């Protein structure tokens, strides 16, 4: 029983350490999602999608992917800001779900 616990504990520690490391070989997930969000076919022809970084008054929604409309001192008003977690593993899962929703949206609109 102790061996199983040690193996499980070692795997958990390894996974946490690996997720905390920044890998410079791959582009940043935020940059990838942002470039996808800025795509013409994703925003739609009528420009109805309100995305991360856009000025807003209430909610920010595009094809079911919702972010929060918050005050920004640097932008001089309210802008859409993405939700996130300080734990990179949770962010990776959230970004994966977001990418799937966006891909579905892009497929429907284009």
Curated annotation (Swiss-Prot):
Probable ion channel inhibitor. It is found in: Secreted. Disulfide bonds join 49-63, 56-69, 60-105, 62-80. GO terms for molecular function: ion channel regulator activity; toxin activity. GO terms for cellular component: extracellular region. Residues 20-43 form a propeptide. Expressed by the venom gland. Its main location: secreted. The presence of a 'disulfide through disulfide knot' structurally defines this protein as a knottin. Keywords: Disulfide bond, Ion channel impairing toxin, Knottin, Secreted, Signal, Toxin. Belongs to the neurotoxin 03 (Tx2) family. 02 subfamily. Residues 1-19 form the signal peptide. This is U32-theraphotoxin-Cg1a.
